[in-house]
């Protein structure tokens, strides 16, 4: 097949939904073209894959594909219509929703990350298939751990409100158990104080009266009294190595229970497991379907579950979690799902073991 991807090329969404599958589709003998703003020329494909809603010109491209009998696939890893006001991308997303819904309806097939999101998307298009986000094993090499216990979080600037969920427990447990708390990726500045200063200089005090600004302020207030190590965001091609270099023993994935988050996937779990860390996540969707170690979204539950993991045999737990990811969320095994739907085989259902894993009660 000649496969053309119409996408931006700088985000984690592109990495998981575009770059990783493209690499392994190429290994299977397919031609994969990345048609982005940097592209200068391309050949007419057998299938065009559109990602999210980045380019208004995509509507014209879809019309051209229709005239030339080219299969159209639309992929999204988020319910963009449910993005909350405190999300960094809220305003930008609102302007793209009409395009998002147009592309959803126009596609011959829609692909996405979880069954929850697939069910949501079927209101626009019945032909939705789940491709779980899948790691590239080539990118992950666990590093030797030191005697210092390291508990941390890695992610994007869209999680200030989510992170705040766990910080009271982190502060209390850190008083009893000596561990280093690590934060990575929530901004590009060299420190969180610099981030706040830059935002204040650029947008003024009114920013901090918005839902986003209030979530940043709440996060910074909760962080007080916690000993932490900070690492800024890195380019997407450096991210796997950066997560491994953090040498986390426990990776946390706090997440508010809201409609947008319920349609996300468990990327943090996959990354932590591949880097050699045990995951502790909020007991909410999507984590409650896959992650073995979860906590209710309150201080006492997070405190209790974190203390349990600090005293547990984390080597064995991590081995089990990494094994599950390598079995069920490995692009080497899952690339056939992409191949089948891109070729037009809508009958290829996702095996149930790829949709979810049984999780013990917390």
Locate predicted features.
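Nucleotide-sugar-dependent
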Residues: 233-271, 281-291
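Donor nucleotide-sugar binding/catalytic pocket of nucleotide-sugar-dependent glycosyltransferases
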Residues: 105-140
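Nucleotide-activated donor-binding/catalytic signature segment of Leloir-type glycosyltransferases, i.e.
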Residues: 185-187, 193-247
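N-terminal pre-catalytic "stem/leader" segment of glycosyltransferase-like enzymes
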Residues: 1-56, 194
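A charged, aromatic-enriched C-terminal amphipathic alpha-helix characteristic of glycosyltransferases
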Residues: 311-347
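Conserved donor-binding/catalytic core segment of Leloir-type glycosyltransferases
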Residues: 143-174, 182-184
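Membrane-proximal helix-turn-helix segments that form the acceptor-binding/catalytic region
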Residues: 91-109
């Amino acid at each position: 097949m000649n496969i053309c991807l119409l996408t931006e090329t700088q985000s984690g969404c592109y990495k998981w939904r575009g770059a990783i599958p493209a690499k392994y589709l190429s290994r299977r003998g397919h031609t994969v073209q990345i048609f982005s703003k940097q592209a200068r020329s391309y050949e007419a494909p057998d299938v065009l894959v559109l990602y999210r809603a980045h380019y208004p010109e995509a509507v014209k491209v879809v019309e051209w594909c229709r005239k030339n009998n080219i299969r159209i696939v639309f992929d999204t890893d988020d319910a963009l219509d449910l993005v909350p006001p405190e999300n960094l991308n809220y305003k930008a997303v609102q302007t793209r929703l009409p395009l998002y819904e147009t592309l959803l309806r126009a596609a011959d097939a829609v692909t996405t990350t979880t069954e929850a999101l697939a069910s949501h998307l079927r209101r626009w298009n019945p032909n939705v298939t789940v491709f779980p986000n899948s790691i590239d094993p080539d990118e992950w090499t666990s590093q030797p751990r030191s005697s210092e216990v390291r508990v941390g979080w890695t992610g994007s600037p869209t999680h200030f409100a989510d992170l705040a969920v766990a910080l009271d427990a982190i502060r209390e447990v850190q008083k009893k158990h000596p561990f280093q708390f690590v934060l990575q990726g929530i901004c590009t500045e060299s420190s969180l104080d610099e981030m706040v200063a830059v935002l204040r200089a650029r947008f003024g005090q009114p920013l901090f009266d918005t839902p986003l600004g209030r979530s940043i302020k709440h996060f910074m207030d909760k962080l007080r009294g916690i000993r932490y190590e900070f690492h800024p965001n890195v380019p997407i091609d450096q991210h796997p190595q950066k997560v491994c270099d953090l040498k986390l023993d426990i990776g946390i994935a706090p997440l508010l229970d809201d409609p947008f988050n319920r349609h996300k996937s468990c990327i943090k779990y996959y990354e932590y497991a591949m880097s050699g860390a045990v995951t502790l996540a909020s007991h909410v969707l999507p984590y409650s379907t896959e992650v073995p170690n979860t906590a209710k979204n309150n201080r006492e539950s997070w405190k209790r579950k974190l203390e349990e993991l600090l005293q547990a045999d984390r080597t064995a737990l991590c081995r089990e979690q990494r094994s599950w990811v390598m079995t069920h969320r490995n692009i080497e095994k899952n690339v056939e799902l992409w191949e089948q739907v891109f070729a037009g085989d809508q009958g290829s259902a996702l095996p149930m073991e790829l949709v979810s894993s049984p999780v013990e009660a917390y």
